[in-house]
């Protein structure tokens, strides 16, 4: 249903932490011009954890309105409360999003049956295409492949974003449910190999700063052209690593600020990038051929 380079869009903020509507609109245009295949709004990279409910819905609406049907918009609507996830997902559907991305419930550590029933409840309550999101490094819960296979039987669960970076796991998922749902990498460092295994795309942090390159790499990998994919990926490989020197989205927001694309705002408890990481992030941007503001 969705494919290619799907940017995990930052939510640009002014220095006081307010959402910058002007920068948000400019980012949407930047991505469409550079070939990004879909925009994922208000996920982890979009600071969903520090936007309140109304802000969350409003950012989704603004992205959908600005995109105006030119590329798909996938809205992050996960929560660790099933009822809240349902309400956020309903809000996204009403705003006109093409699909929703639902992270596994975090912190309260549900069982596999709890994960199944949570996602089943959201899917049954809101008839919009839904993509599961497994990122155990952040959530403290891991959705096992067996649970994914069960959920793949639900008609409007259409995909999985797997951010584990475990390619053996990805290979097993492709074999067991690749014909029922689409599988997306959520780990830039292993995304190329994930796509060569049969993945349909990547929900990418790197795409915030290198959208054209991520689009080109995805196209090459998905058509099975390893040599072309490797050549493109080599230019952005340092970004895949250095954009995670501190917790995402700290480094990528700083990088976008240096590129002149967003203001400096980020919400507590996240802080601006530590000075010791400025040089490594600049090095990664330079390796990718990205021009910074003077």
Curated annotation (Swiss-Prot):
Keyword check for Cytoplasm: yes
Biological process terms in GO annotation: diaminopimelate biosynthetic process; lysine biosynthetic process via diaminopimelate
GO MF annotations in UniProt: 4-hydroxy-tetrahydrodipicolinate synthase activity
Sections of the chain in a coiled coil: none
Compartment(s) of residence: Cytoplasm
Active-site residues annotated for this sequence: 133 (proton donor/acceptor), 161 (schiff-base intermediate with substrate)
Keywords tagged on the record: Amino-acid biosynthesis, Cytoplasm, Diaminopimelate biosynthesis, Lyase, Lysine biosynthesis, Schiff base
Cellular component per GO, a single term: cytosol
The enzyme's E.C. designation: 4.3.3.7
SMART domains noted in UniProt: DHDPS (SM01130)
Family: Belongs to the DapA family.
NCBIfam families: dapA
Protein's name according to its UniProt entry: 4-hydroxy-tetrahydrodipicolinate synthase
Gene name, Swiss-Prot/TrEMBL: dapA
